[in-house]
Curated annotation (Swiss-Prot):
Residues 67-349, 452-496 are annotated as: Disordered. InterPro entries: Nucleotide-bd_a/b_plait_sf, RBD_domain_sf, RBM, RBM1CTR, RRM_dom. Disulfide bonds: none annotated. It comes from Homo sapiens (Human). This is RNA-binding motif protein, Y chromosome, family 1 member D. The lineage of its organism: Eukaryota, Metazoa, Chordata, Craniata, Vertebrata. It holds the Pfam family RBM1CTR.
Amino acid sequence: MVEADHPGKLFIGGLNRETNEKMLKAVFGKHGPISEVLLIKDRTSKSRGFAFITFENPADAKNAAKDMNGKSLHGKAIKVEQAKKPSFQSGGRRRPPASSRNRSPSGSLRSARGSRGGTRGWLPSQEGHLDDGGYTPDLKMSYSRGLIPVKRGPSSRSGGPPPKKSAPSAVARSNSWMGSQGPMSQRRENYGVPPRRATISSWRNDRMSTRHDGYATNDGNHPSCQETRDYAPPSRGYAYRDNGHSNRDEHSSRGYRNHRSSRETRDYAPPSRGHAYRDYGHSRRDESYSRGYRNRRSSRETREYAPPSRGHGYRDYGHSRRHESYSRGYRNHPSSRETRDYAPPHRDYAYRDYGHSSWDEHSSRGYSYHDGYGEALGRDHSEHLSGSSYRDALQRYGTSHGAPPARGPRMSYGGSTCHAYSNTRDRYGRSWESYSSCGDFHYCDREHVCRKDQRNPPSLGRVLPDPREACGSSSYVASIVDGGESRSEKGDSSRY
Protein backbone atom coordinates (compact mmCIF):
# COMPACT_ATOMS: atom_id res chain seq x y z
CA MET A 1 0.00 0.00 0.00
CA VAL A 2 1.10 3.51 -0.78
CA GLU A 3 1.00 5.74 2.26
CA ALA A 4 1.51 9.45 2.77
CA ASP A 5 5.11 10.41 3.11
CA HIS A 6 4.66 13.41 5.32
CA PRO A 7 1.47 15.27 6.14
CA GLY A 8 2.86 18.62 4.98
CA LYS A 9 4.85 17.42 1.94
CA LEU A 10 3.67 18.02 -1.61
CA PHE A 11 4.78 16.64 -4.95
CA ILE A 12 5.00 19.14 -7.80
CA GLY A 13 5.50 17.65 -11.25
CA GLY A 14 5.62 18.94 -14.83
CA LEU A 15 7.79 21.92 -14.02
CA ASN A 16 9.63 23.93 -16.57
CA ARG A 17 13.32 23.18 -16.82
CA GLU A 18 14.03 26.83 -16.08
CA THR A 19 12.14 26.87 -12.79
CA ASN A 20 14.36 26.80 -9.70
CA GLU A 21 13.92 26.55 -5.93
CA LYS A 22 13.48 30.31 -5.37
CA MET A 23 10.64 30.56 -7.85
CA LEU A 24 8.86 27.59 -6.26
CA LYS A 25 9.23 29.04 -2.78
CA ALA A 26 7.89 32.39 -3.89
CA VAL A 27 4.82 30.84 -5.56
CA PHE A 28 3.92 28.23 -2.86
CA GLY A 29 4.93 30.47 0.07
CA LYS A 30 1.63 32.33 -0.32
CA HIS A 31 -0.24 29.38 1.23
CA GLY A 32 1.86 29.11 4.35
CA PRO A 33 5.34 28.83 5.77
CA ILE A 34 7.61 26.39 3.83
CA SER A 35 10.25 24.42 5.64
CA GLU A 36 11.95 22.83 2.63
CA VAL A 37 12.05 23.10 -1.18
CA LEU A 38 13.75 20.22 -2.99
CA LEU A 39 14.22 20.44 -6.77
CA ILE A 40 15.30 17.18 -8.37
CA LYS A 41 18.21 17.56 -10.76
CA ASP A 42 20.16 15.28 -13.02
CA ARG A 43 23.91 14.74 -13.13
CA THR A 44 24.46 17.91 -15.09
CA SER A 45 22.67 19.93 -12.34
CA LYS A 46 19.70 20.63 -14.58
CA SER A 47 16.15 20.35 -13.37
CA ARG A 48 14.38 17.11 -14.10
CA GLY A 49 10.93 18.74 -14.03
CA PHE A 50 9.66 17.88 -10.55
CA ALA A 51 10.20 19.00 -6.96
CA PHE A 52 9.09 18.41 -3.35
CA ILE A 53 7.87 21.19 -1.09
CA THR A 54 7.36 20.65 2.64
CA PHE A 55 5.02 22.91 4.55
CA GLU A 56 5.29 23.37 8.28
CA ASN A 57 1.58 22.93 8.63
CA PRO A 58 -0.11 19.99 6.89
CA ALA A 59 -3.31 21.97 6.48
CA ASP A 60 -1.42 24.55 4.46
CA ALA A 61 -0.12 21.78 2.22
CA LYS A 62 -3.64 20.54 1.53
CA ASN A 63 -4.82 23.99 0.63
CA ALA A 64 -1.83 24.57 -1.69
CA ALA A 65 -2.47 21.25 -3.46
CA LYS A 66 -6.11 22.12 -4.12
CA ASP A 67 -5.27 25.60 -5.28
CA MET A 68 -2.17 24.98 -7.43
CA ASN A 69 -2.99 21.62 -9.00
CA GLY A 70 -3.41 21.95 -12.78
CA LYS A 71 -2.35 25.57 -12.98
CA SER A 72 0.29 26.96 -15.32
CA LEU A 73 3.68 27.88 -13.98
CA HIS A 74 6.29 29.41 -16.28
CA GLY A 75 4.42 28.26 -19.32
CA LYS A 76 3.67 24.68 -18.19
CA ALA A 77 0.77 23.15 -16.34
CA ILE A 78 1.92 21.61 -13.11
CA LYS A 79 0.58 18.80 -11.02
CA VAL A 80 0.40 19.26 -7.26
CA GLU A 81 -0.63 16.46 -4.87
CA GLN A 82 0.23 14.87 -1.59
CA ALA A 83 3.57 13.13 -1.73
CA LYS A 84 3.35 9.39 -1.19
CA LYS A 85 5.94 6.92 -0.14
CA PRO A 86 6.59 3.97 -2.40
CA SER A 87 5.67 0.61 -0.92
CA PHE A 88 9.30 -0.49 -0.69
CA GLN A 89 10.35 2.77 0.99
CA SER A 90 7.87 2.90 3.86
CA GLY A 91 9.80 3.79 6.96
CA GLY A 92 12.94 4.34 4.95
CA ARG A 93 14.51 7.21 3.14
CA ARG A 94 12.05 9.46 1.40
CA ARG A 95 12.22 9.97 -2.33
CA PRO A 96 11.28 13.29 -3.96
CA PRO A 97 7.87 13.27 -5.66
CA ALA A 98 7.46 14.35 -9.27
CA SER A 99 5.18 17.14 -10.39
CA SER A 100 1.83 16.32 -11.94
CA ARG A 101 -0.25 18.20 -14.47
CA ASN A 102 -3.96 18.10 -15.30
CA ARG A 103 -4.41 14.57 -14.05
CA SER A 104 -6.20 13.33 -11.02
CA PRO A 105 -4.02 11.67 -8.43
CA SER A 106 -6.26 8.63 -8.25
CA GLY A 107 -6.23 8.04 -12.01
CA SER A 108 -2.51 8.45 -12.17
CA LEU A 109 -2.08 6.07 -9.32
CA ARG A 110 -4.27 3.38 -10.84
CA SER A 111 -2.55 3.66 -14.17
CA ALA A 112 0.87 3.56 -12.66
CA ARG A 113 0.04 0.62 -10.46
CA GLY A 114 -1.67 -1.28 -13.23
CA SER A 115 1.10 -0.94 -15.76
CA ARG A 116 4.25 -0.59 -13.75
CA GLY A 117 3.41 -1.61 -10.23
CA GLY A 118 6.43 -1.93 -8.01
CA THR A 119 8.71 0.38 -9.99
CA ARG A 120 10.60 3.14 -8.33
CA GLY A 121 9.70 6.75 -8.41
CA TRP A 122 6.74 8.64 -7.14
CA LEU A 123 3.57 6.99 -8.30
CA PRO A 124 1.33 9.97 -9.11
CA SER A 125 3.60 11.16 -11.89
CA GLN A 126 4.71 7.92 -13.53
CA GLU A 127 1.95 7.52 -16.04
CA GLY A 128 0.90 10.77 -17.54
CA HIS A 129 3.90 12.95 -18.00
CA LEU A 130 6.13 11.12 -20.39
CA ASP A 131 5.76 13.90 -22.89
CA ASP A 132 6.79 16.87 -20.86
CA GLY A 133 10.43 15.85 -20.59
CA GLY A 134 10.39 16.36 -16.86
CA TYR A 135 9.72 12.90 -15.57
CA THR A 136 10.66 10.73 -18.48
CA PRO A 137 14.30 10.27 -17.44
CA ASP A 138 13.22 9.29 -13.96
CA LEU A 139 10.76 6.80 -15.36
CA LYS A 140 13.41 5.16 -17.50
CA MET A 141 15.77 5.13 -14.63
CA SER A 142 13.17 3.64 -12.32
CA TYR A 143 12.15 1.11 -14.92
CA SER A 144 15.70 -0.07 -15.45
CA ARG A 145 16.26 -0.19 -11.75
CA GLY A 146 13.08 -2.10 -11.17
CA LEU A 147 14.12 -4.87 -13.55
CA ILE A 148 17.43 -5.51 -11.88
CA PRO A 149 16.22 -7.27 -8.73
CA VAL A 150 13.55 -9.23 -10.63
CA LYS A 151 15.56 -11.50 -12.94
CA ARG A 152 13.54 -14.66 -12.84
CA GLY A 153 12.48 -14.73 -16.43
CA PRO A 154 10.28 -12.73 -18.79
CA SER A 155 8.25 -10.25 -16.76
CA SER A 156 4.52 -10.39 -17.44
CA ARG A 157 3.86 -6.92 -16.13
CA SER A 158 6.75 -4.93 -17.51
CA GLY A 159 7.30 -6.95 -20.72
CA GLY A 160 9.94 -4.75 -22.32
CA PRO A 161 12.50 -5.49 -24.99
CA PRO A 162 15.12 -6.77 -22.56
CA PRO A 163 12.98 -9.71 -21.37
CA LYS A 164 12.07 -10.56 -24.96
CA LYS A 165 15.73 -10.64 -25.86
CA SER A 166 16.76 -12.59 -22.82
CA ALA A 167 14.13 -15.27 -23.25
CA PRO A 168 15.10 -16.23 -26.81
CA SER A 169 18.72 -16.12 -25.84
CA ALA A 170 18.05 -18.55 -23.04
CA VAL A 171 16.06 -20.77 -25.35
CA ALA A 172 18.72 -20.59 -28.02
CA ARG A 173 21.34 -21.34 -25.44
CA SER A 174 19.45 -24.37 -24.23
CA ASN A 175 18.73 -25.44 -27.78
CA SER A 176 22.33 -25.06 -28.76
CA TRP A 177 23.35 -27.05 -25.72
CA MET A 178 20.83 -29.75 -26.53
CA GLY A 179 21.86 -29.71 -30.15
CA SER A 180 25.44 -30.07 -29.17
CA GLN A 181 24.54 -32.88 -26.84
CA GLY A 182 22.90 -34.75 -29.65
CA PRO A 183 25.86 -34.80 -32.03
CA MET A 184 28.20 -35.44 -29.18
CA SER A 185 26.23 -38.44 -28.04
CA GLN A 186 25.93 -39.57 -31.62
CA ARG A 187 29.63 -39.22 -32.07
CA ARG A 188 30.13 -41.26 -28.98
CA GLU A 189 27.89 -43.93 -30.39
CA ASN A 190 29.62 -43.86 -33.72
CA TYR A 191 33.20 -43.68 -32.57
CA GLY A 192 33.18 -45.10 -29.09
CA VAL A 193 31.48 -48.44 -29.66
CA PRO A 194 33.10 -49.74 -32.88
CA PRO A 195 36.64 -49.64 -31.50
CA ARG A 196 35.39 -51.77 -28.64
CA ARG A 197 33.85 -54.21 -31.09
CA ALA A 198 37.00 -54.27 -33.14
CA THR A 199 39.00 -55.03 -30.04
CA ILE A 200 36.72 -57.87 -29.11
CA SER A 201 36.79 -59.32 -32.58
CA SER A 202 40.54 -59.10 -32.77
CA TRP A 203 40.78 -60.71 -29.38
CA ARG A 204 38.56 -63.50 -30.56
CA ASN A 205 40.59 -64.00 -33.69
CA ASP A 206 43.82 -64.05 -31.75
CA ARG A 207 42.80 -66.28 -28.89
CA MET A 208 39.66 -68.18 -29.78
CA SER A 209 40.08 -69.22 -33.38
CA THR A 210 42.79 -71.58 -34.42
CA ARG A 211 42.03 -71.96 -38.06
CA HIS A 212 41.81 -68.31 -38.94
CA ASP A 213 44.92 -67.03 -37.25
CA GLY A 214 47.27 -68.02 -39.98
CA TYR A 215 48.50 -71.08 -38.18
CA ALA A 216 47.63 -73.93 -40.49
CA THR A 217 45.08 -72.69 -42.99
CA ASN A 218 44.91 -71.28 -46.49
CA ASP A 219 46.69 -68.14 -47.51
CA GLY A 220 43.55 -66.03 -47.55
CA ASN A 221 42.98 -66.50 -43.85
CA HIS A 222 46.33 -65.25 -42.73
CA PRO A 223 46.52 -61.95 -40.84
CA SER A 224 48.23 -58.87 -42.10
CA CYS A 225 51.96 -58.37 -42.14
CA GLN A 226 52.01 -56.70 -38.77
CA GLU A 227 49.77 -59.36 -37.27
CA THR A 228 51.94 -62.01 -38.86
CA ARG A 229 54.90 -60.48 -37.20
CA ASP A 230 53.18 -60.85 -33.86
CA TYR A 231 51.09 -63.97 -34.26
CA ALA A 232 52.15 -65.89 -37.35
CA PRO A 233 55.61 -66.97 -36.10
CA PRO A 234 54.05 -68.87 -33.21
CA SER A 235 52.05 -70.79 -35.82
CA ARG A 236 54.90 -73.24 -36.04
CA GLY A 237 53.31 -74.76 -32.99
CA TYR A 238 54.98 -72.67 -30.36
CA ALA A 239 53.03 -69.88 -28.81
CA TYR A 240 49.56 -71.00 -29.77
CA ARG A 241 50.28 -74.44 -28.46
CA ASP A 242 51.47 -72.78 -25.30
CA ASN A 243 48.43 -70.53 -25.20
CA GLY A 244 46.14 -73.50 -25.26
CA HIS A 245 47.51 -75.00 -22.07
CA SER A 246 47.03 -72.40 -19.36
CA ASN A 247 46.75 -68.72 -18.80
CA ARG A 248 50.19 -68.71 -17.32
CA ASP A 249 51.69 -70.03 -20.51
CA GLU A 250 49.61 -67.66 -22.60
CA HIS A 251 50.67 -64.58 -20.74
CA SER A 252 54.27 -65.66 -20.60
CA SER A 253 54.53 -66.34 -24.31
CA ARG A 254 52.42 -63.45 -25.56
CA GLY A 255 53.30 -60.97 -22.89
CA TYR A 256 57.03 -61.28 -23.30
CA ARG A 257 56.76 -61.33 -27.03
CA ASN A 258 54.64 -58.18 -27.12
CA HIS A 259 56.22 -56.07 -24.42
CA ARG A 260 59.86 -56.93 -24.11
CA SER A 261 62.25 -54.66 -25.93
CA SER A 262 65.23 -55.84 -27.89
CA ARG A 263 67.52 -55.04 -24.99
CA GLU A 264 65.40 -57.13 -22.65
CA THR A 265 65.39 -59.89 -25.22
CA ARG A 266 69.14 -59.92 -25.18
CA ASP A 267 69.08 -60.12 -21.41
CA TYR A 268 66.47 -62.81 -21.07
CA ALA A 269 67.04 -64.96 -24.12
CA PRO A 270 70.78 -65.19 -24.85
CA PRO A 271 71.77 -66.96 -28.01
CA SER A 272 73.77 -69.68 -26.38
CA ARG A 273 73.74 -73.05 -28.05
CA GLY A 274 70.68 -74.75 -26.71
CA HIS A 275 70.90 -72.45 -23.71
CA ALA A 276 67.27 -71.45 -23.91
CA TYR A 277 66.23 -75.06 -23.72
CA ARG A 278 68.62 -75.87 -20.95
CA ASP A 279 67.35 -72.93 -18.92
CA TYR A 280 63.67 -72.84 -19.77
CA GLY A 281 62.90 -75.73 -22.03
CA HIS A 282 62.49 -78.65 -19.61
CA SER A 283 58.77 -78.16 -19.41
CA ARG A 284 56.09 -76.97 -21.75
CA ARG A 285 55.51 -73.96 -19.59
CA ASP A 286 59.14 -73.01 -19.71
CA GLU A 287 59.25 -73.33 -23.47
CA SER A 288 56.75 -70.55 -23.75
CA TYR A 289 59.18 -68.20 -22.07
CA SER A 290 62.08 -69.01 -24.34
CA ARG A 291 59.89 -69.04 -27.42
CA GLY A 292 58.21 -65.83 -26.43
CA TYR A 293 61.55 -64.15 -26.10
CA ARG A 294 62.88 -65.46 -29.35
CA ASN A 295 59.84 -64.63 -31.43
CA ARG A 296 60.16 -60.93 -30.77
CA ARG A 297 63.80 -60.38 -31.56
CA SER A 298 64.77 -57.83 -34.09
CA SER A 299 66.72 -58.61 -37.20
CA ARG A 300 69.90 -57.28 -35.66
CA GLU A 301 69.56 -59.57 -32.68
CA THR A 302 68.80 -62.49 -34.92
CA ARG A 303 71.82 -61.77 -36.98
CA GLU A 304 73.84 -61.65 -33.78
CA TYR A 305 72.40 -64.92 -32.61
CA ALA A 306 72.30 -66.75 -35.90
CA PRO A 307 74.37 -65.06 -38.61
CA PRO A 308 74.39 -67.75 -41.28
CA SER A 309 70.65 -68.10 -41.73
CA ARG A 310 69.60 -66.38 -44.91
CA GLY A 311 66.99 -68.55 -46.53
CA HIS A 312 67.37 -71.92 -44.94
CA GLY A 313 64.54 -71.39 -42.53
CA TYR A 314 62.10 -72.71 -45.07
CA ARG A 315 64.14 -75.78 -45.58
CA ASP A 316 64.44 -76.37 -41.90
CA TYR A 317 60.80 -76.15 -40.97
CA GLY A 318 59.00 -76.78 -44.17
CA HIS A 319 59.63 -80.49 -44.58
CA SER A 320 57.12 -81.96 -42.19
CA ARG A 321 53.41 -81.69 -41.82
CA ARG A 322 54.01 -80.57 -38.30
CA HIS A 323 56.05 -77.69 -39.58
CA GLU A 324 53.84 -77.06 -42.55
CA SER A 325 51.83 -74.29 -40.97
CA TYR A 326 54.91 -72.55 -39.79
CA SER A 327 56.64 -72.73 -43.14
CA ARG A 328 53.51 -71.42 -44.87
CA GLY A 329 53.21 -68.59 -42.44
CA TYR A 330 56.78 -67.64 -43.11
CA ARG A 331 56.66 -68.10 -46.83
CA ASN A 332 53.54 -66.06 -47.31
CA HIS A 333 53.98 -63.17 -44.96
CA PRO A 334 57.31 -62.17 -43.47
CA SER A 335 59.94 -60.41 -45.45
CA SER A 336 63.49 -61.61 -45.75
CA ARG A 337 64.30 -59.68 -42.64
CA GLU A 338 61.52 -61.41 -40.77
CA THR A 339 62.80 -64.71 -42.07
CA ARG A 340 66.11 -63.82 -40.60
CA ASP A 341 64.33 -62.91 -37.42
CA TYR A 342 62.44 -66.08 -36.86
CA ALA A 343 63.99 -68.82 -38.91
CA PRO A 344 67.63 -68.87 -37.66
CA PRO A 345 66.98 -69.67 -34.03
CA HIS A 346 65.60 -73.03 -35.13
CA ARG A 347 68.99 -74.58 -34.76
CA ASP A 348 68.90 -73.70 -31.08
CA TYR A 349 65.53 -75.06 -30.15
CA ALA A 350 64.39 -76.92 -33.22
CA TYR A 351 64.74 -80.25 -31.53
CA ARG A 352 63.53 -78.77 -28.33
CA ASP A 353 60.34 -77.71 -30.02
CA TYR A 354 59.88 -80.46 -32.53
CA GLY A 355 62.04 -83.24 -31.32
CA HIS A 356 59.48 -85.08 -29.23
CA SER A 357 58.25 -87.94 -31.32
CA SER A 358 54.57 -88.57 -30.70
CA TRP A 359 54.21 -85.41 -28.69
CA ASP A 360 55.42 -83.27 -31.52
CA GLU A 361 53.29 -85.09 -34.02
CA HIS A 362 50.23 -84.21 -32.03
CA SER A 363 51.32 -80.63 -31.90
CA SER A 364 51.39 -80.57 -35.68
CA ARG A 365 47.94 -81.97 -36.29
CA GLY A 366 46.08 -81.73 -33.08
CA TYR A 367 47.10 -78.34 -31.88
CA SER A 368 46.01 -76.51 -34.94
CA TYR A 369 42.43 -77.58 -34.37
CA HIS A 370 42.07 -78.79 -30.82
CA ASP A 371 44.74 -77.47 -28.54
CA GLY A 372 43.44 -73.93 -28.21
CA TYR A 373 40.26 -75.21 -26.53
CA GLY A 374 41.53 -77.58 -23.90
CA GLU A 375 44.37 -77.88 -21.53
CA ALA A 376 44.45 -81.62 -21.46
CA LEU A 377 45.57 -81.83 -25.06
CA GLY A 378 48.77 -80.01 -24.26
CA ARG A 379 49.36 -81.71 -20.93
CA ASP A 380 48.89 -85.37 -21.74
CA HIS A 381 50.29 -85.70 -25.19
CA SER A 382 50.45 -89.41 -25.57
CA GLU A 383 46.76 -89.85 -24.69
CA HIS A 384 45.24 -87.16 -26.87
CA LEU A 385 46.84 -87.72 -30.21
CA SER A 386 44.84 -87.37 -33.40
CA GLY A 387 44.25 -90.32 -35.67
CA SER A 388 47.12 -90.08 -38.05
CA SER A 389 49.42 -88.72 -35.40
CA TYR A 390 48.54 -91.61 -33.14
CA ARG A 391 49.22 -94.08 -35.93
CA ASP A 392 52.54 -92.49 -36.68
CA ALA A 393 53.43 -92.43 -33.02
CA LEU A 394 52.58 -96.13 -32.70
CA GLN A 395 54.66 -96.96 -35.71
CA ARG A 396 57.52 -95.01 -34.35
CA TYR A 397 57.03 -96.48 -30.96
CA GLY A 398 57.01 -99.97 -32.41
CA THR A 399 60.27 -99.50 -34.19
CA SER A 400 62.07 -97.58 -31.50
CA HIS A 401 60.75 -99.03 -28.24
CA GLY A 402 63.60 -99.37 -25.86
CA ALA A 403 66.07 -97.87 -28.26
CA PRO A 404 68.43 -95.20 -27.03
CA PRO A 405 68.20 -91.68 -28.40
CA ALA A 406 69.82 -91.63 -31.78
CA ARG A 407 71.47 -88.79 -33.57
CA GLY A 408 70.05 -89.83 -36.85
CA PRO A 409 66.90 -88.41 -38.37
CA ARG A 410 63.56 -89.31 -36.88
CA MET A 411 61.12 -90.89 -39.32
CA SER A 412 57.39 -91.33 -39.46
CA TYR A 413 54.79 -92.29 -42.04
CA GLY A 414 51.88 -90.48 -43.62
CA GLY A 415 53.75 -87.33 -44.39
CA SER A 416 53.94 -86.24 -40.77
CA THR A 417 57.05 -85.53 -38.77
CA CYS A 418 59.88 -86.93 -40.77
CA HIS A 419 62.60 -84.38 -40.47
CA ALA A 420 66.04 -85.68 -39.73
CA TYR A 421 67.45 -84.26 -36.59
CA SER A 422 71.15 -84.34 -36.09
CA ASN A 423 72.47 -81.87 -33.61
CA THR A 424 75.79 -80.40 -34.46
CA ARG A 425 78.51 -78.66 -32.61
CA ASP A 426 78.74 -76.14 -35.34
CA ARG A 427 75.45 -74.51 -34.35
CA TYR A 428 76.44 -71.27 -35.97
CA GLY A 429 77.42 -73.12 -39.08
CA ARG A 430 74.85 -75.22 -40.87
CA SER A 431 73.11 -77.03 -38.10
CA TRP A 432 69.73 -76.07 -39.51
CA GLU A 433 70.55 -78.03 -42.61
CA SER A 434 70.40 -81.16 -40.56
CA TYR A 435 66.62 -80.87 -40.54
CA SER A 436 66.17 -82.47 -43.90
CA SER A 437 62.83 -83.65 -45.15
CA CYS A 438 62.14 -87.29 -45.68
CA GLY A 439 58.56 -87.63 -46.72
CA ASP A 440 56.55 -84.46 -46.49
CA PHE A 441 53.78 -84.86 -49.04
CA HIS A 442 51.50 -82.16 -47.78
CA TYR A 443 54.22 -79.61 -47.92
CA CYS A 444 54.95 -80.50 -51.49
CA ASP A 445 51.34 -80.10 -52.43
CA ARG A 446 50.85 -76.77 -50.76
CA GLU A 447 54.09 -74.93 -51.33
CA HIS A 448 55.40 -76.64 -54.50
CA VAL A 449 58.63 -77.48 -52.77
CA CYS A 450 58.76 -81.21 -53.36
CA ARG A 451 62.43 -81.71 -52.96
CA LYS A 452 62.80 -84.75 -50.82
CA ASP A 453 66.15 -85.44 -49.38
CA GLN A 454 67.49 -88.25 -51.52
CA ARG A 455 70.54 -88.65 -49.42
CA ASN A 456 68.59 -89.66 -46.31
CA PRO A 457 65.62 -91.77 -47.43
CA PRO A 458 63.06 -92.81 -44.87
CA SER A 459 64.04 -95.97 -43.18
CA LEU A 460 62.97 -97.62 -40.01
CA GLY A 461 66.52 -98.64 -39.42
CA ARG A 462 67.18 -95.33 -37.81
CA VAL A 463 65.34 -95.90 -34.65
CA LEU A 464 63.46 -93.22 -32.83
CA PRO A 465 63.26 -92.44 -29.12
CA ASP A 466 60.42 -93.66 -27.02
CA PRO A 467 57.48 -91.26 -27.22
CA ARG A 468 57.28 -91.29 -23.50
CA GLU A 469 60.91 -90.36 -23.33
CA ALA A 470 60.40 -87.63 -25.91
CA CYS A 471 57.44 -86.21 -24.06
CA GLY A 472 58.49 -86.32 -20.47
CA SER A 473 62.23 -86.54 -20.34
CA SER A 474 64.26 -83.42 -20.44
CA SER A 475 67.51 -85.29 -19.98
CA TYR A 476 66.87 -86.94 -23.30
CA VAL A 477 66.56 -83.59 -24.97
CA ALA A 478 69.56 -82.24 -23.16
CA SER A 479 71.62 -85.17 -24.30
CA ILE A 480 70.54 -84.64 -27.86
CA VAL A 481 71.09 -80.92 -27.78
CA ASP A 482 74.41 -80.93 -26.03
CA GLY A 483 76.05 -83.98 -27.48
CA GLY A 484 75.82 -84.99 -31.08
CA GLU A 485 77.88 -85.13 -34.18
CA SER A 486 77.08 -82.73 -36.96
CA ARG A 487 75.42 -84.56 -39.76
CA SER A 488 75.14 -81.47 -41.88
CA GLU A 489 73.54 -82.19 -45.15
CA LYS A 490 74.19 -80.03 -48.17
CA GLY A 491 71.39 -81.10 -50.40
CA ASP A 492 69.53 -79.47 -53.19
CA SER A 493 67.11 -78.02 -50.66
CA SER A 494 69.66 -75.61 -49.24
CA ARG A 495 68.44 -72.89 -51.56
CA TYR A 496 64.86 -71.68 -51.66
